[in-house]
């Protein structure tokens, strides 16, 4: 009974808090540090990020989508869709119908992005709201004829400080107000490719810089008076795994390059056959024991990577740490793109703000779950998506959430309370029961004679 009262009272308080703050427009800043592997948090020191986490929430592993590349996963974060659904299926793509090509240097055609509606477009279309972006993939493209009110054209030479200055200026002073903003930074991905994630000396230096940037971000938000009312999510698109020159898969040793066109290379190679598809497949399937070769229709269902015309007829997937090359060596000591079930491919998520609990840790969510959570925070109606809002409820202060250990504890506690109450009721009933009054045995008149003569 006491437990029920407490739960009801907590619900009323939560509801009151939610209602009392509803007059303030919710604001959300989404930050991505490209290639931030989840276990970097355990293997390196991050004083600024750990302070951020102590005052907010941490999701230790975010299971991203296959293929675990930059453009596809950044679009999954903001649409809640698998790659086959939102259409950005790789960093390099080819559309057989239009004959168009997509790459990181040729990504401005809305054709590639229009199969989905990212959250900044949905937010931008609301009354008295606007969106802002500092180089998040796709934000400098007019998607469904809509672009953010404030954005920066992508230029990797622009410093983090300049990007941060613009984003905080737009969040602090714009009309209509910026209620959703994104900020993207290329590290630690670039250094992860160069050194490999197991290079402690170099990665320690790089990750310290990342932590300092997070400290700068928090300090700037506090200085501008944005910190207490702004929801901030820090996450990434993928992790990184160690590669080496002795783990190469040379396609030229297996098949003549004139038999196919290579759309995307490693570690997931997209093959467009120029001759009979089956013949190309048969030549490739025995190329290496460290590479899986799939016809498009045979790609495992768990990848959600079949139902899009931009996915090529044959897909090659290298084992973790192996690199697919064309008769040449690889300069990369780190890479990503591999099977999304691998922990090395997973990023993390940390969040702080009025929408989030404080000091809460959660083991895992899916990257597509971030989108419905962000829509909830901003009060937006989400477009159809592959995410599950229930997976993120435990992170949010306005949601009642219970996990399995807590459920077991509540059941056991409830049974103990009920048992104690039952015992108390029985004891009280026994104490309060009225005893029968004492009375002498009444004898009949003829019973006055003695029984023994």
UniProtKB/Swiss-Prot annotation:
One of its GO terms (cellular component) is ficolin-1-rich granule membrane. It is an enzyme of class 3 (hydrolase). The chain crosses the membrane at residues 408-428. Binds 2 Zn(2+) ions per subunit. InterPro entries: Alkaline_phosphatase_core_sf, Phosphodiest/P_Trfase. It is found in: Cell membrane. Disulfide bonds join 254-287, 394-401. It holds the Pfam family Phosphodiest. Glycans are attached at residues 155, 166, 276, 386. The keyword Cell membrane applies. It comes from the Eukaryota. The active site is at 70 (amp-threonine intermediate). GO terms for molecular function: bis(5'-adenosyl)-triphosphatase activity; metal ion binding. Hydrolyzes extracellular Ap3A into AMP and ADP, and Ap4A into AMP and ATP. Ap3A and Ap4A are diadenosine polyphosphates thought to induce proliferation of vascular smooth muscle cells. Acts as a procoagulant, mediating platelet aggregation at the site of nascent thrombus via release of ADP from Ap3A and activation of ADP receptors. Belongs to the nucleotide pyrophosphatase/phosphodiesterase family. This is Bis(5'-adenosyl)-triphosphatase ENPP4. The gene is ENPP4.
